[in-house]
């Protein structure tokens, strides 16, 4: 699963390891460094969180070795593969929230996984850190991320959030289930989880999939397509590629 997610980065890293044994010195590209570090951090942090969030729930009665293995497995597959060794529907709310985050981040660029990609998440974190330090540019490892790439990353993340919100709203709108309002709160969470899972092309579900009607299934199919191709890719394909070099007078507004 890991090698399938980080194919391009491993393709860059393996020749460097080979050259190191031969006495040659080559450096990893910045992209490969960011992908490997971000992926490893997400897996480790996710596994630790799942372990402590579920040690009194689904991990009760299993050995420590098995519990650790389950935690790492679920942390890895939540961003790409969608396999499951536990019943997702009985996880704690905190674990569900964590899985939503991991599915939103998704896999690495160049893989068949969906989501906003781990490099986008890394750039967003670097942007926040550099701004807090007073840096105008986004710097990492003696390199500067181009401002155009930073702007594209922000656009991808915000467009993804908006699309997820719209699709979730559509699932609720087309719902034909009956019952008390309070009883539908659980269904609301299930729809959100289903939408995030489709966006990340993960395949995890809290069990609501068989109960979706035709219109809701169409929405999920659309979400999977958008998650795989990417919201900005679709936008660029839809609109004209002609650049408009129009600049108006600047005016500030209050924010925050």
Locations of the language-model features?
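Membrane-proximal intracellular helices of multi-pass ion channels
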Residues: 5-256
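Glycine-rich, basic loop-to-helix element that forms the pyrophosphate-binding segment
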Residues: 1-3
């Amino acid at each position: 699963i890991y090698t399938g997610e980080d194919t391009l980065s491993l393709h860059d890293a393996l020749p460097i390891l080979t050259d190191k044994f031969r006495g040659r010195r080559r450096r990893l590209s910045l992209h490969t460094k960011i992908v490997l570090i971000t992926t490893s951090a997400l897996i480790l942090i996710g596994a630790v969180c799942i372990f402590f969030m579920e040690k009194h729930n689904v991990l009760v009665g299993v050995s420590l070795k098995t519990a650790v293995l389950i935690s790492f497995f679920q942390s890895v597959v939540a961003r790409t593969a969608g396999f499951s060794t536990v019943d997702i529907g009985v996880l704690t709310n905190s674990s569900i929230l964590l899985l939503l985050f991991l599915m939103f981040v998704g896999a690495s660029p160049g893989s068949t996984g969906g989501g906003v990609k781990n490099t986008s998440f890394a750039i967003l974190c670097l942007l926040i850190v550099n701004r807090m330090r007073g840096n105008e540019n986004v710097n990492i490892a003696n390199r500067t991320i181009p401002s155009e790439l930073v702007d594209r990353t922000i656009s991808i993340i915000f467009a993804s959030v908006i699309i997820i919100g719209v699709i979730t709203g559509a699932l609720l709108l087309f719902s034909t289930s009956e019952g008390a309002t309070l009883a539908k709160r659980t269904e609301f969470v299930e729809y959100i989880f289903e939408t995030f899972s489709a966006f990340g092309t993960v395949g995890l579900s809290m069990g609501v999939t068989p109960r979706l009607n035709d219109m809701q299934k169409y929405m999920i199919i659309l979400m999977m397509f958008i998650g795989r191709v990417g919201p900005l890719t679709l936008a660029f394909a839809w609109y004209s590629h002609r650049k408009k070099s129009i600049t108006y007078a600047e005016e500030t507004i209050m924010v925050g």
